[in-house]
Swiss-Prot record:
This is Doublesex- and mab-3-related transcription factor C1. Belongs to the DMRT family. Expressed in Sertoli cells in male testis. The gene is Dmrtc1. Residues 26-48, 136-174 are annotated as: Disordered. Keywords: Phosphoprotein, Transcription, Transcription regulation. Residues 26-39 have a biased composition (Polar residues). It comes from Mus musculus (Mouse). It comes from the Eukaryota. Pfam families: DMRT-like. InterPro entries: DMRT-C1/C2_C. Disulfide bonds: none annotated.
Length: 182
């Protein structure tokens, strides 16, 4: 019973919407012709109806209408009938059909990704320094000692094993001993 009432109401709304669209299309056509010769004209007549393709969305929503020959820019239709939404008859570009919005979650995701990448690079640099230090203890020392107050990478010394450095205190180093940092 309720479904029948909704169907009747939808059919009557659909028919009324179709008639309104046909009247508006005829008024727009007439206004376009008259405006080009005489300037702006107020429309209050109801010329004969014409066929207009239409696509209703669902019951309770606005009627979606595509007008043939309507430019993709602004139109006089929204000011005359604000309950209509105009759209082009066909869209062939698939990129226009997909949302192009980049929300805050995408921005946060990019920031987290960059931070993780930086952390991985830092860990790789520390691992390379540790590897270089371990290989230097097996070979002869570099021969160019750092200054007495310098913290960080300790050059190989036969009496003292190399001390690993933290990521915050990496020295710029001597070119003949360390070529990792740029």
């Amino acid at each position: 019973m309720v479904e029948e009432e909704v169907a009747k109401k939808y059919d009557s709304s659909f028919t009324a919407g179709k008639n309104t669209v046909q009247q508006i299309q005829a008024q727009v056509d007439t206004a376009t012709q008259e405006e080009s010769s005489q300037g702006p004209v107020l429309l209050n007549q109801h010329p004969e109806t014409t066929s207009v393709p239409y696509t209703p969305e669902t019951v309770g929503q606005q009627l979606m209408v595509s007008l043939p020959g309507e430019p993709h820019g602004t139109s006089a239709m929204p000011s005359m009938c604000p309950s209509l939404i105009l759209q082009p008859c066909a869209t062939t570009d698939p990129m226009l059909l997909q949302p192009q919005v980049m929300g805050p979650s995408a921005s946060n995701q990019a920031s987290v990704s960059a931070t993780l990448e930086w952390q991985e690079m830092l860990e790789a640099a520390e691992a390379l320094l540790a590897l270089k230090n371990s290989s230097q203890t097996r070979h002869q020392p570099c021969g160019m000692p750092g200054t007495a107050g310098e913290r960080g990478l300790q050059l190989a010394n036969p009496s003292m094993p190399p001390r690993p450095t933290s990521s915050g205190s990496l020295p710029s180093g001597h070119l003949d001993c360390m070529s990792l940092l740029t």
